[in-house]
Structures are given as structure tokens and as C-alpha cells.
Curated annotation (Swiss-Prot):
<dbReference type="GO" id="GO:0030686">
    <property type="term" value="C:90S preribosome"/>
</dbReference>
<keyword id="KW-0539">Nucleus</keyword>
<feature type="compositionally biased region" description="Basic residues">
    <location>
        <begin position="1"/>
        <end position="15"/>
    </location>
</feature>
<keyword id="KW-0597">Phosphoprotein</keyword>
<dbReference type="Pfam" id="PF15341">
    <property type="entry name" value="SLX9"/>
</dbReference>
<dbReference type="GO" id="GO:0005730">
    <property type="term" value="C:nucleolus"/>
</dbReference>
<feature type="modified residue" description="Phosphoserine">
    <location>
        <position position="38"/>
    </location>
</feature>
<feature type="modified residue" description="Phosphoserine">
    <location>
        <position position="192"/>
    </location>
</feature>
<protein>
    <recommendedName>
        <fullName>Ribosome biogenesis protein SLX9 homolog</fullName>
    </recommendedName>
</protein>
<dbReference type="GO" id="GO:0030688">
    <property type="term" value="C:preribosome, small subunit precursor"/>
</dbReference>
<feature type="region of interest" description="Disordered">
    <location>
        <begin position="1"/>
        <end position="43"/>
    </location>
</feature>
<comment type="similarity">
    <text>Belongs to the SLX9 family.</text>
</comment>
<comment type="function">
    <text>May be involved in ribosome biogenesis.</text>
</comment>
<dbReference type="GO" id="GO:0000462">
    <property type="term" value="P:maturation of SSU-rRNA from tricistronic rRNA transcript (SSU-rRNA, 5.8S rRNA, LSU-rRNA)"/>
</dbReference>
<dbReference type="InterPro" id="IPR028160">
    <property type="entry name" value="Slx9-like"/>
</dbReference>
């Protein structure tokens, strides 16, 4: 059997009036509707409470208050940020075309940046060609370099120890010096007019002169 609930009267409270205004009359109390009697002994029976249907009978609403208009200065910040114009819906082909144009612009920008970088590297690596006379005057001549080299070699020969006659007692540097001297002497002999006239006579004179020099060194 269902629960029996107490019925509470639902009555609107009297309106609050300022002092001095007398109430037009006593507020009539709402008549409580009679509850329908639930059948006795019915399993799963429910109690139904009927509420007064005319609850907004005394409510007064001005029709002008229902009409509202959204002005531009009264818009919210969100609506202003979004913009008044709605976004146009583009077809798929137009979207792909716009995306392709954006990609082409990005690729072109990357190419321009790389080209500028290459040109800058070229300018840095390029040698400035101008008047070479001051540079040529500042550099020493080849003859002066050769003369200085010969003087250095002569000083080394004077300061160094006397070279032994036997090859077995010579060092590697001394052997190289001996070979260089012999090569120079042989080239001078080939370039001399005496060798062109009589090679055997020129070679004999050169050997005799060399033997005299070596004999004088030994003495």
C-alpha cells in the first residue's frame, strides 16, 4: 500500500504594500481540492495530488518588455572579436587551391633566403682585385731570395764541422749535400763550351781540378 502524504495548501502570499495603503479586502484562501480516495486493498496504488492549474492568473507582464533589440554598443567583447560577418564556406577545391598557394609562398621564401645566404658567402670568399703594384713592391725579388739562401748555406758550411771524405762516415745530411754539389757541378760542366767542343777533355780537367781540391783539403 502506498504512503499517505499530507496535503499542503499552496497559496500565493499577499503583495507587500506601502504604509497608508489599505488592503482592498481580505485575501481569499484557496480552496483545497478534494483528494480522490484510493481503492482499498489495491496493490501498488498511488496517491495523486492535483495542483491548481491557474498559478499565473495574477501575474502582469508588460508586452513591451518582451521586445528586445541588440544594439552595436551593447555587444559583448567575444562577438566583437569574432566579427560581424560570418565566414564564407568554401568548397573543397577552393580550400586545396588556397593551401597550395600558401605552400608555394613558403617554398619561395625559403629559396630566397638560401639564395641570399649563398650570395653573401660568395661575397665573403671573393678576393678584391685591385692595383697589385704596391703588393709587388712590398714583396722581395726572386734574386734577393736566392742570394739570401746562398748566404745562409755558406754560413752553415762555415760553422758546421768539416765533412769527412769517406761516405761511410758521412751523415745523411752530409750525403745529401754532397749529392747536391755533384749535381750542380755536373750541370755546369754540361753547359760549358769546353764540354761541347771536347767532352772527354772537359771531364778530365774537371776530375783533375776536383782531385786537387780534395788533396788540398786533406793536407
Amino acid at each position: 500500500m502506498g504512503k499517505v502524504r499530507a496535503l499542503r495548501a499552496r497559496v500565493h502570499r499577499a503583495a507587500v504594500r506601502p504604509d497608508g495603503d489599505s488592503a482592498p479586502g481580505p485575501v481569499p484562501r484557496a480552496v483545497e481540492p478534494a483528494l480522490p480516495q484510493s481503492p482499498a486493498g489495491g496493490a501498488g496504488a498511488k496517491d495523486w495530488t492535483f495542483v491548481h492549474n491557474d498559478i499565473f492568473a495574477r501575474t502582469q507582464i508588460d508586452p513591451s518588455a518582451l521586445v528586445q533589440r541588440l544594439e552595436l554598443d551593447q555587444r559583448s567583447v567575444v562577438s566583437l572579436k569574432r566579427g560581424a560577418e560570418p565566414k564564407a564556406i568554401l568548397p573543397k577545391k577552393e580550400k586545396l587551391k588556397l593551401r597550395r598557394e600558401r605552400w608555394l609562398q613558403k617554398i619561395e621564401a625559403i629559396k630566397l633566403a638560401e639564395q641570399k645566404l649563398r650570395e653573401e658567402r660568395k661575397r665573403k670568399a671573393m678576393v678584391v682585385v685591385g692595383d697589385l703594384h704596391p703588393l709587388r713592391d712590398a714583396l722581395p725579388e726572386l734574386q734577393e731570395l736566392e742570394a739570401g739562401r746562398q748566404r745562409q748555406q755558406a754560413r752553415r758550411r762555415v760553422t758546421s764541422k768539416p765533412r769527412p771524405v769517406e761516405l761511410s762516415r758521412m751523415t745523411t745530411v752530409q750525403r745529401q749535400q754532397l749529392l747536391e754539389e755533384e749535381r750542380t757541378r755536373f750541370q755546369k760542366l754540361l753547359a760549358s763550351p769546353t764540354y761541347r767542343a771536347s767532352p772527354l777533355l772537359a771531364i778530365g780537367q774537371q776530375l783533375a781540378h776536383q782531385m786537387q781540391l780534395e788533396g788540398g783539403k786533406q793536407l
